[in-house]
From Swiss-Prot:
Taxonomic lineage of the native organism: Bacteria, Pseudomonadati, Pseudomonadota, Gammaproteobacteria, Enterobacterales
First-level EC class: lyase
The protein's Enzyme Commission number: 4.1.2.19
Protein's recorded name: Rhamnulose-1-phosphate aldolase
Gene encoding the protein: rhaD
Organism: Yersinia pseudotuberculosis serotype IB (strain PB1/+)
Cofactor remark from the record: Binds 1 zinc ion per subunit.
Amino acid sequence: MQAILSSWFIQGMIKATSDMWHKGWDERNGGNISLRLLAEEVEPYRRDFYQHPRKVELTQPAPELANSWFLVTGSGKFFRNVELNPAENLVLLQVSNDGMAYHIHWGLTQGGLPTSELAAHFQSHIVRMQVSGGTNRVIMHCHATNLIALSYVQKLENASFTRLLWEGSTECLVVFPDGIGIVPWMVPGTDGIGTQTAEQMREHSLVLWPFHGIFGSGPTLDDAFGLIDTAEKSAEIMVKVLSMGGKKQTISREQLIALAARFDVTPMAAALDA
């Protein structure tokens, strides 16, 4: 067995993709994850790498990510199959030193490419690296059922959507005080939707793609998963509340401010006033 299969990052990706599939967020080949790795984390597994790594040109140059390593889910791959055959469904790649291409060093044993949303992932990684001082290393996308459902019936505006989720569960303001960003509906797998997502990622760790899914970022796979899980739980509660006729009482603005003070977070000001 290849040593890399027992690495923390392969095992972590197996756990994340399995959990997300069991949640019902990643039907068929839906969803994608990218994890930025450090050179020293990858180095011990070089003996498992391809002798002649395949080079693929990027549709959008990413010089800010030059020489960076990423573990990424494959395009057209099913999350439910990652734990059965990680080498077929995942890919370890390194961006070239000019940021114009990447080399596939491991994975995708049956051929193929990384996720079709790689442009969105890379653009979001660049922004989250900047705003987090390099601590954010994960971009995660999935089709979270109730967040998608709310996008059909709620105003697609950052502040009001954030406020709705904050009121849906007390922990939400603590977990994502920076709120949720929203992009217009756009064709997926394009540089354009990647640019729009990255712009929202500058202010928000969560970005909603209406009628499609959610993007989340964080330092670790657990953090990114937990962020989406928390928002999706609140969305599920609000879907049930709306189905029962709507709110009769809720968490007030003053209570949200008190909550933020207790947990020493700075809430999105526009959402407090929404």
